[in-house]
Amino acid sequence: MNELIKHKLELLPDSPGCYLHKDKAGTIIYVGKAKNLRNRVRSYFRGSHDTKTELLVSEIADFEFIVTGSNTEALLLEINLIQENMPKYNIKLKDDKSYPFIKITNEPFPRLLITRQIKKNDGLYFGPYPDAYTATEVKKLLDRIFPFKKCKNPVNKVCFYYHLGQCQAHTICHTDKAYWDSLVADVKQFLNGKDDKIIDDLRSKMLEASHNQEFERAAEYRDLISGIATMRTKQRVMSKDLQDRDIFGYFVDKGWMCVQVFFVRQGKLIQRDVNMFPYYNEAEEDFLTYVGQFYSDQRHLIPKEVFIPETIDETLVAAIVPARIVKPQRGEKKQLVALATKNARVSLQQKFDLLEKDLRKTSGAIEHLGQLLGIEKPVRIEAFDNSNIQGTSPVAAMVVFVDGKPSKKDYRKFKIKTVIGPDDYASMREVIYRRYSRVKHEGLQAPDLIIVDGGQGQVKAARDVIEHQLGLSIPVAGLQKNDKHQTHELLFGNPLAVVELPRNSEEFFLLHRIQDEVHRFAITFHRQVRSKNAFSSKLDHIAGLGPKRKQLLLKRFKSMTALEQASLEEIQQLGIPKTVAEALFDHLTSKSEV
């Protein structure tokens, strides 16, 4: 068991869901379901197993999980994931290309059938069901409750089921279409979970039979009610309208966004897409940008419907996605979006929790890191990251790790003062010079290692300042991210070269944590500065409203939206002169009326 799996096992939720075991290449090799993900997944890595399971466990290099709302949902999601991914360790059904549905034919005398093929305009379909046994059990229950035609005999002949009270085709004439339409409508209501009327009717018949001392018939009605109860747990993962749709949910925290997309095809949740990335603007804006990029990828086919969270403007999504955009307001469809959002929250929290785990081993990690770089053990590490959007409101941040743990009292923020426009190299030079000129001239504690977020350009800029401008001797390394904004490579040495670092090592885990922390700190500061600047710039033309009063307003109202909703009295309560407060209030009022 590698370190990544050890950390992930500690973070599993006590929830029902599906888990996906992966090999070193990232290929899904097994899909399973669990009433309790924490207990089930942990069981693979504890105790002894049979030969087949031992072989599976030996190939597991990573795993993912999807939280569901019930064990029924987990079961149905499992069969969809197996069908879609065909993992080599899953037992394949003999007819694994399709799953059974219950069909109501559109014949003059409708019949209930079990089928594995869906044909358009050929009847109504309900399902899919996880196996033929389940579908058969449901059909048996329907046959006992609803008197559909059971066989292909001519309607002028009495069949066996007529004598059981389970077929009325012989007694209902061809012209009584309303009867059959009503029966079909009752089945649709029943299979969609609206079964209270049926249960009330059966309960009345049971009581009547019992009153008449027809105890066998009363027991039959009792069994029917019990059978219905076993079907009442409705699952949200499957959609009964067989519609193709993508379901989006997202969650943001600590400067990061996680977006989860559930792919529903023919009513089945067949796959999900998970992506985590830092966001720089408002969450809704960056979510829209992500959706646009998502569908520009030719691998992602556009479905008939796209479900989005209610905080998102559907007209903006409709402008970039040629599909029906839906913001579900109630019921199962809203719960599907909520489920995607819940999984986004769980995934993002897992990312943060992974970075917090196993700090006791970081002492060994920093010692090994020093050995890899050929330097003394880097007890104190200072890491830097720049943050700006096309050069606006440029800032930088520094985080400090001592003995592998964050020392937040030593964190520092920098506003870029000498650089105009988006120039990461010049910004890095400025920040490094400001920080280490103080270290040199004020006798502050110097780090054992400097890490900059970036590639060769950033490393060379920082090293040039340290060595040539300040005459210091502090090692400088660089951390590069891949196109998914994940820690990818460590650069060090002269000339710079990639340091071979095992992905599952404690050293890599530590560097990943440092890079994520400095990035989080930088973009959080950048967002604060941008918000403050935007707030101030909108008030620049108000006479008598200087920097101190703007700061006072920002501290009290937090945002322009809140300020625009403030009354004149609330503004004056801050000690702002009446004439200035009135000018500000008039400006805000006229702005809101435009």
From Swiss-Prot:
GO cellular component: cytoplasm; excinuclease repair complex
Location of this chain's protein in the cell: Cytoplasm
Record keywords: Cytoplasm, DNA damage, DNA excision, DNA repair, Excision nuclease, SOS response
Gene3D superfamilies from the UniProt entry: 5' to 3' exonuclease, C-terminal subdomain, GIY-YIG endonuclease, UVR domain, UvrC, RNAse H endonuclease domain
One GO term of the biological process aspect: nucleotide-excision repair
A Pfam family per the record: UvrC_RNaseH_dom
Domain of life of the source: Bacteria
Limits of the UVR domain: 196-231
Family matches, as NCBIfam families: uvrC
Family: Belongs to the UvrC family.
Protein name per the record: UvrABC system protein C
Species for this entry: Streptococcus equi subsp. equi (strain 4047)
Gene: uvrC
